[in-house]
UniProtKB/Swiss-Prot annotation:
Subcellular location: Cell membrane; Golgi apparatus
PROSITE patterns reported in the protein's UniProt record: PRION_1 (PS00291), PRION_2 (PS00706)
Binding site for Cu(2+) 2: 62-64
Name the UniProt record assigns to this protein: Major prion protein
PANTHER family documented for this protein: DOPPEL PRION, MAJOR PRION PROTEIN
Species of origin: Cercopithecus mona
GO BP annotations listed: protein homooligomerization
Residues excised as propeptide: 224-246
Length: 246
């Protein structure tokens, strides 16, 4: 028994002193001409530890720290500081740009919609350009050939802000021609005196149509309010509510 114990103890001592061929963090990361025959050299010359395809530490494809594919700090794909991909990538946890909601992008200008930046003016619905005779063949033909260049919508304010139709139409014509001229001029198209003359006639007719439409809607709303605010109607509605609740 004593002899067996001594032999076992001697074998353990020899195992501890025996150098290991590679392994994690052994042999150093040497470049060509600086390594020993089994060290961690680059280019690879064999003799690496377990999991070392090219003579690096455990999990080191080309020699470097744990989790380093090409050498560098922890989490560095190509060298650099923590969370830096070789200085070419954005830093970790950089907040992404907020996505624009589709709700904020939707909605073209609708009839009666308030136009921003025009001081409370609204944009009317599209109309067919009226057929107008200007008294001579040249202008009539010119209008037919160029009517598509003129507005088919008008800008206006609510009718209750004007004392009469003439004031509404005058303001409507001025703001509509001004906006259309500025918008079209920025696109490189200019208007002649003939164009302005014809636009005034066309837009005037459209503003009159818009006034009649808005006036009718305004009076209908007023009539509805008067109807529902009259005492008999209020009494009838109250009685119906009492029957439903009771």
């Amino acid at each position: 028994m004593l002899v067996l114990f001594v032999a076992t103890w001697s074998d353990l001592g020899l195992c501890k002193k025996r150098p290991k061929p590679g392994g994690w963090n052994t042999g150093g990361s040497r470049y060509p001409g600086q390594g020993s025959p089994g060290g961690n050299r680059y280019p690879p010359q064999g003799g690496g530890g377990w999991g070392q395809p090219h003579g690096g530490g455990w999990g080191q494809p080309h020699g470097g720290g744990w989790g380093q594919p090409h050498g560098g700090g922890w989490g560095q794909p190509h060298g650099g500081g923590w969370g830096q991909g070789g200085g070419t990538h954005n830093q970790w946890h950089k907040p992404s740009k907020p996505k624009t909601s589709m709700k904020h992008m939707a909605g073209a200008a609708a009839a009666g919609a308030v136009v921003g930046g025009l001081g409370g003016y609204m944009l009317g619905s599209a109309m067919s350009r009226p057929l107008i005779h200007f008294g001579n063949d040249y202008e009539d033909r010119y209008y037919r050939e160029n009517m598509y260049r003129y507005p088919n919508q008008v800008y206006y304010r609510p009718v209750d802000q004007y004392s009469n139709q003439n004031n509404f139409v005058h303001d409507c014509v001025n703001i509509t021609i001004k906006q259309h001229t500025v918008t079209t001029t920025t696109k490189g198209e200019n208007f002649t005196e003939t164009d302005v003359k014809m636009m005034e006639r066309v837009v005037e007719q459209m503003c009159i149509t818009q006034y009649e439409k808005e006036s009718q809607a305004y009076y209908q709303r007023g009539s509805s309010m008067v109807l529902f605010s009259s005492p008999p109607v209020i009494l009838l509605i109250s009685f119906l509510i009492f029957l439903i609740v009771g």
